[in-house]
Design a protein with these regions (language model features):
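Solvent-exposed strand-loop boundary residues in beta-sheet-rich modules
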Residues: 158-161
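Active-site-proximal substrate-binding groove within the catalytic cores of carbohydrate-active enzymes
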Residues: 1-151, 156, 178
């Protein structure tokens, strides 16, 4: 671009980042970018910050990186914000799919899984980075997680997913560009 050349425009402000608690660097980027692009260019994670998305398009992909949508011109992220509050996200620890110490692993690289752990409960977010339906087995390391999950459910998130109980994560099928949020206790 004309301001930062081949670098992300955020690099122009690197010296200010220690004084920032969230970034908003996804404007002008499409939600159809690659998984690596989301991590490096849009998420804020390389700078030790969380980012936000401009709108409510493909919220699952944003959630894989801890990104919530701002209150956009269209869409309604409030049910998702309420879910984070209900879960106690402010006290949770995030383990991204890239973290070697993550207690949750997906066997399909097109379906990365990020887990948020808060005491004896956890929330997994899985997003499909392809246009086609994908399947994955999600493996949970109970020792690393710190508890043995006994109940699994997909919470209802208005305009995002229907609520339902599920038996586990041995077989997850997710539509193209879709995703799922799962609670377990």
């Amino acid at each position: 671009n004309q301001w930062a050349g081949y670098a992300n425009s955020l690099h122009l402000y690197t010296e200010l980042l220690p004084y920032v608690d969230r970034t908003w660097i996804g404007e002008g980027f499409t939600e159809n970018n690659s998984l690596d692009f989301w991590l490096v260019e849009m998420s804020g994670i390389p700078f030790g910050l969380l980012s936000e998305t401009l709108d409510a398009r493909n919220q699952y992909r944003g959630l894989v990186f801890g990104m919530l949508p701002r209150l956009p011109w269209s869409g309604n992220p409030v049910p998702l914000w309420n879910l984070w509050d209900q879960f106690g996200m402010k006290d949770a620890k995030m383990f991204g799919y890239w973290d070697k110490n993550s207690p949750v692993k997906s066997d399909n690289a097109s379906l990365p899984a990020t887990v948020y752990v808060n005491g004896k409960k956890a929330m997994i977010v899985i997003a499909n980075w392809t246009d086609m339906p994908q399947q994955a087995k999600i493996t949970i390391d109970e020792t690393a997680l710190g508890f043995k999950p006994t109940k699994f459910s997909e919470p209802e998130i208005r305009n995002l997913q229907w609520g339902r109980k599920i038996s586990g994560l041995n077989h997850c099928e997710i539509m193209g560009r879709g995703g799922m949020v799962v609670f377990f206790l």
